[in-house]
Amino acid sequence: MQPLHFSFLFVGFLLLSLVLRLWLASRQVRHVSRHRDAVPEPFASRISLPAHQRAAAYTIARVQLGIVDQFVGAVVLLALTLLGGLQFIHETWMRWLPDQPLLQQLLVMGTALLLISLAELPVDWWRHFRLETRFGFNRMTPALFVADHLKALLVGALLGLPLLAALIALMQHTGQRWWLWAWAFWIGFNVVVLLLFPTVIAPLFNRFEPLADGPVKERILALLARCQFSAGGLFVMDGSRRSAHGNAYFTGFGKSRRIVFFDTLLARLEVDEVEAVLAHELGHFKKKHILKRLVLQGVFSLVAFALLGWLSSQIWFYQGLGIAIGPFQAQAPAGVALLLFFLALPVFLLPLRPLMAWMSRRDEFEADAFAVEHSNGHALVSALTKIYEDNGSTLTPDPLHSAFYDSHPPAPLRIGRIRQRPAETVPAAPAQP
């Protein structure tokens, strides 16, 4: 392939991605706006019209900010590639550190990633202190915002720099099959991060307290016993320091596996509703969704590293993305190849987005069915309804937008599936007082 042809292909996919995302966003805004004045029937007795309209306005605002975010990302990507930004960074560090190639490559990658983070910072700030604050969700202070970003930068450097150094060394010293060794190291690195996250990384950003004794803990322990699930601990996270949104999740595996509840979730839900939410999360584990996802990610990363192994030896790959290759060079430095690949790859993966979203929604339906079987269907409906309302989730998403992006099924469809379970399991929802 000629470098110019690859440049056109890259720009074409990028423009196609932007146009498609803009079209889907416009559909979402129009659809949500058309349905903002009537609460869907399954929720009419539980969610008020003002709350429904607030969720519609919140959804539209998020979509509009998402458009800005997409354009900022596209501009930064083009600036680093075809407009010569990465080439300039590479040449600058070559001049300053001509005799230290490994440090030079790490600094090239670190500089580019830092610039990307700085470009994303204004949108992130607006999201927290304008959009989320406008709708009453933000509880983060500017000081906490800055602290979070500095901690993320530090953790990223402590984990990322050794990872990148190891990958570069493998690329340079393990022959033509370096990509296989690099993939194996990548898998091992991710396993270590999964082990460290619950007990080392997550506590850097949030406080975790053991779940207090009481009715909630008793119901949860009984549920875990019924489902034959052992956890390394039950914890409450101070999510209210940052947001009014609520959630619950599993993290870690083996002895480090733990169950985490946001304090905002526990403050809002009744005991049986908390049990139903946890039963849903248990469903993901019991149906092996997490294991399947890890295997899928492993296969995908293997294909990605194999593709990188081939592309890194193709001069048109570098030249087509704005990196000059001298007449006596077979390829660019390993660090530049890594960075270019992981910058360009997402542009070509857009067609996989709806497939991944569909797989995730399928898993959500299975987890809901497990929750109905092992807890209480009505409590699950009630809990989900409160979560939709408290998180400002629209009840009327555009079907195509939802199919393309959403990892969870649309609210009416999800509640409808739960209510299709046996009547004795899912009693009718009580009316709103």
Residue ranges and their predicted role:
Residues 3-330, 350-433:
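Polar-ligand-bearing catalytic/cofactor-coordination segments
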Residues 344-349:
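Alpha-helical transmembrane segments of multi-pass integral membrane proteins
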Residues 330-340:
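Loop-to-helix entry region at the N-terminal start of transmembrane alpha-helices
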